[in-house]
Amino acid sequence: MNTRHFSQLPKPYLAYPKVIQGLIFKKPKGEKVLPQVEYVVDTLNIDSKHLESYNEICGFKNDGFVPAIYLAVLSQSLQMHMMTSEAFPFAILGLVHIRNQIKQTRKIAVNEQITLSCKFGELQPHDKGLQFDFITTAKVGGEVVMESLTTYLSRQKTEKKASEKSKESKEPAYQPKAEWNISENTGRRYALISGDFNLIHIHAVTAKAFGFKQAIAHGMWSKAKALASIELPAAYEADVWFKLPMYLPSTVEFLT
């Protein structure tokens, strides 16, 4: 596996021109293979002002610690550059974020120096195409403090039919915990912080071009909002499947 080292986190917007090129130059047909490469930011110092802005929009406290999901969001910049700089087999526009797993082994202080790495995981068949993973790891002095698995779907023509879902399903006895009034500009505000300017999140006009009636919230924002709404232990795991869109604006009932 090839490893590419960075002295600082690469800017996500520098990859956008190559994303646009993907609309013009189509990916070659044939067998899909993920690049065997790992991108590593050797020394990542947390920008406290940026973290405060992230905490504000997601609802986390400014308590001197870094939410594990924040590091997963930072790794999306590495993911973007991996998809645009390597022999990535799929068109980036149109990828669907379907899952995110996070594991935090202990609390991470804002002033700790972090080594952040990201590599491609497995490529697997999906009933709507092919899915693949990004594996992100954060270390402090060689100690793993955070791991994240991000799964995307690339829609492809497939002969495999979707498995039939059982009609009998018991829902857990959730209790209402909070009601969120999510404003229309949430997607734009979060994009300025996360660097994820996917058009489905920015405005109703651009979202409609992709088949949505309104702009929808970022999945990683909604996950962060949920995590910020509960008391988390020092070590935990959070596994989320993104099933349905959260339209902007909207009122959402949060259950636990």
Where are these regions (language model features)?
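A structural connector/turn signal
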Residues: H97, K103-T105, G211, E237, ...
